[in-house]
Amino acid sequence: NLIQFANMIGCANHGSR
């Protein structure tokens, strides 16, 4: 589930940018 957590952060990171 670590990948899922990182995936969520990555998606939010792009949205914030």
Swiss-Prot record:
Query: What domain of life is recorded for the organism?
Result: Eukaryota
Reaction it catalyzes:
a 1,2-diacyl-sn-glycero-3-phosphocholine + H2O = a 1-acyl-sn-glycero-3-phosphocholine + a fatty acid + H(+)
Q: How is the cofactor bound?
A: Binds 1 Ca(2+) ion.
Q: Which UniProt keywords apply?
A: Calcium, Hemostasis impairing toxin, Hydrolase, Lipid degradation, Lipid metabolism, Platelet aggregation inhibiting toxin, Secreted, Toxin
User: EC?
Assistant: 3.1.1.4
Q: Where in the cell is it found?
A: Secreted
Annotated GO biological processes are: lipid catabolic process
Which coenzymes or cofactors are required? Ca(2+)
Secreted as a keyword of this entry, yes or no, is yes
Entry GO MF terms = phospholipase A2 activity; toxin activity
| Gene Ontology CC terms | extracellular region
Top enzyme class of this protein?
A: hydrolase
- In which broad location class does this protein mainly occur, judging by the first location in its UniProt entry? secreted
Report where it is expressed, by tissue. Answer: Expressed by the venom gland.
The Swiss-Prot or TrEMBL record describes its family as follows: Belongs to the phospholipase A2 family. Group I subfamily.
Q: What does this protein do?
A: Snake venom phospholipase A2 (PLA2) that inhibits collagen-, ADP-, thrombin-, ionophore-, adrenaline-, ristocetin-, and arachidonic acid-induced platelet aggregation. Inhibits serotonin release. PLA2 catalyzes the calcium-dependent hydrolysis of the 2-acyl groups in 3-sn-phosphoglycerides.
Q: What is the protein's name according to its record?
A: Phospholipase A2
Q: Which organism is it from?
A: Austrelaps superbus
